[in-house]
Regions:
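Domain-level detector of nuclease and nuclease-like folds
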Residues: 88-205
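Classical eukaryotic N-terminal signal peptides for Sec-dependent ER targeting/secretion
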Residues: 1-6
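N-terminal module-boundary/linker segments of secreted carbohydrate-active enzymes
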Residues: 9-81
């Protein structure tokens, strides 16, 4: 419950002026369990306006811009120029950047509408590294088959990780001690966890 409450607060802080927070939280008061989940989902969808999949390119120029004006890529340290370095095709790391669904879009049917274009969990990333991640769940890697700039893919450690078609409302698949996962760079694990939690709260069902 603490994690859910903390996550709700983090989501609210990103989209809601401080003076409006009491009103924003009003429907969450006194709720727990499924009723709290439903109320959070309603709140996160209220007033939401989709940018569209193509609109993400423009939005990234504001949401994911480094202090030097370059693209902020959480999968690599490559230096990208907005627009000029958009993918396109790629064969190696640092060829171009694309739009990464931190919650893989195949988990909700492959659509680029609805959750498929929600910038809360989409970020610009290296096209090659994104391709290597594929639609594997995030997790801790025990033995890497691929790594670049601290991001890696490989066998999961002995923990249970939820994957599968979660957003569509299914239970998903459980990986415990085996299977392939993708581990983001350490400094961005919190960012991706926040994107996961926010995306799942908003679109599950």
């Amino acid at each position: 419950m603490f994690l859910l409450t903390l996550t709700v607060f983090a989501i609210a802080k990103t989209v809601t002026p401080a003076s409006s927070l009491p009103d924003y939280y009003a429907d969450l008061q006194g709720k727990s369990g499924k009723s709290l989940f439903d109320a959070v989902q309603k709140v996160t969808k209220t007033g939401y306006s989709s940018l569209g999949y193509s609109g993400l390119w423009t939005a990234f120029k504001t949401t994911d811009k480094k202090s030097n004006g370059k693209v902020w890529d959480m999968y690599s340290d490559c230096s990208w120029t907005f627009g000029a370095d958009q993918c396109g095709t790629y064969s190696d790391e640092c060829d171009c950047y694309n739009r990464e669904h931190s919650i893989p879009k195949s988990w909700f049917g492959g659509s680029t509408s609805g959750p498929g274009c929600d910038i809360f969990h989409l970020v610009p990333t290296d096209g090659k590294v994104n391709g290597m991640r594929s639609n594997y769940a995030f997790g801790e890697v025990s033995s890497a088959s691929y790594s670049y700039d601290g991001a890696k893919k490989g066998s999961a450690k002995s923990i249970t990780i939820m994957g599968g078609n979660t957003i569509a409302g299914n239970d998903g698949t459980s990986i415990s001690g085996s299977g392939t996962v993708f581990e983001p760079r350490d400094e961005y694990k919190g960012d991706f966890a926040r994107g996961y939690m926010g995306g799942l709260l908003k679109w599950a069902g």
